[in-house]
Amino acid sequence: MRIADKTVTRAILERHGFTFKKSFGQNFLTDTNILQKIVDTAEIDKGVNVIEIGPGIGALTEFLAENAAEVMAFEIDDRLIPILADTLARFDNVQVVNQDILKADLQTQIQAFKNPDLPIKVVANLPYYITTPILMHLIEGKIPFAEFVVMMQREVADRISAMPNTKAYGSLSIAVQYYMTAKVSFIVPRTVFVPAPNVDSAILKMVRRDQPVVSVQDEDFFFRVSKVAFVHRRKTLWNNLTSHFGKSEDTKAKLEKALEIAKIKPSIRGEALSIPDFASLADALKEVGI
């Protein structure tokens, strides 16, 4: 029987006297069909290494280890380490690292793979409260992970994968899609977790682009401008720009000029701008001396 089988999960938790900690956002998946779908979505085979974040008691790790060359699982909760040693004992291609992924030296850690030159995919069931910081840390980090298949709160998955002119579209959509393609693969109902969370989850598949989707003069400034445009979603782009950059006559003249160069109407809202539009705007703002 699988670790994810509800009776097995309960038995493991009872045997080790494990209690859930809200501070870690722990929700363990107990549906083997969904676990298999995650592995299939990630296209895991013996030609790839996997970094897993938040293995819990090893339900997904079991499926990954059966299919991948190697799995390196990062678990922050000390109490789960002996449980994982028990549940994953039959595998010789799994390393469990008791560390916060945000603090890990991944450049060094991945050298512990037997074949560190294999492509590395990131597969994770991320705690809702820290999904965005972990994702951006890995996407923007020094290691160009080729692919991410991540379970997260459905609302966050919708925001990351959103297109312009939708309610979900915002600076997070732009921050991720600048580097990656992003698509919701399927929805995971809250009922298949122990304990059950308050909302449904989604599996989001992100694949790194060969190069960023647009070329910009200053990446940091580009992301700053995209954030400014969504500070007040109901306000026009002009109102958000003047609120952030200033309302002096000189500044307003520069903003008008930049919008003219970028061929963007000041009366539209940020959600109407595509990533190329934001790139044009950021470069134009630089050009006029903002």
Curated annotation (Swiss-Prot):
Catalytic activity entry: adenosine(1518)/adenosine(1519) in 16S rRNA + 4 S-adenosyl-L-methionine = N(6)-dimethyladenosine(1518)/N(6)-dimethyladenosine(1519) in 16S rRNA + 4 S-adenosyl-L-homocysteine + 4 H(+)
Keyword annotations of the record: Cytoplasm, Methyltransferase, RNA-binding, rRNA processing, S-adenosyl-L-methionine, Transferase
Protein name: Ribosomal RNA small subunit methyltransferase A
EC class of the enzyme, as a word: transferase
Positions of S-adenosyl-L-methionine binding: N27, L29, G54, E75, D100, N125
Cellular localisation: Cytoplasm
Gene behind this protein: rsmA
Enzyme Commission identifier(s): 2.1.1.182
SUPFAM superfamilies cross-referenced by the UniProt entry: S-adenosyl-L-methionine-dependent methyltransferases
